[in-house]
Amino acid sequence: DIYAKWFAWVVEHADGFACISRTVRDELREAVAGRIGQERSERLTYSYFHLGSELDLRENSGGTPGELADVFADPASVFLMVGTLEPRKNHAYVLDVFDKLWREGSESKLCLVGGIGWKCEALVDRIRHHAHAGSKLFWFAKLDDDGLDYAYRHADALLISSHAEGFGLPIVEALQRGLPVMAGDLPVFREVGGDFVAYFDLTDPKSLKALVTSYQRDKADLAPRPPAEWRWIDWKDSANQLVAAATSGTL
């Protein structure tokens, strides 16, 4: 396993680690201790910083593809997923939920944005040959920045269902644009999204189905706090955090 060999080498040679979330820092500290022992692990530094986002908020140049605009052309709710197609992103979980909703007569749409990753042949085949492909299920594998911005600004909610993440940047990108977010109940998502996100149980598809059904009915954000109150650091603050993390190891 390439990653396992790389990580084993890093653990033996690094003096410290700067991670992109507090959650990852804590998980990494535990993993390192498991490999080299608690005493050696405590000699290393562990810090974290958060990614910024405001550079994404720019004026759209008008280059939005017509096919993308068509997805949002009617009143049906559009739920957006952003991320490479790979097992960790857990697209199949969301597809299972929407298959049940569509069988029950839902007119809501699911729009996937992300390129082909790895170990996703079955998922790609499922999407391409889905009964609702092009009518209720849409996939854009090569969307440019303008297109992604358009999708964020016109969707009804972002869904993020990953089994594991280091940060969860789509949460920040969505909330920056006032888009409600529904996310799997992971520690890192709660770290980033806090009370601005509605969480669902990744072991129980019924919990996501209930959120989507409620949103379809009421068109109201289900999180305790609305996106309008969302504030996040900019890239200058992010860079300052990284410098502090790299120089002090105590962030």
Predicted regions and their residues:
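Carbohydrate transferase catalytic cores enriched for Leloir-type hexosyltransferases
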Residues: 1-251
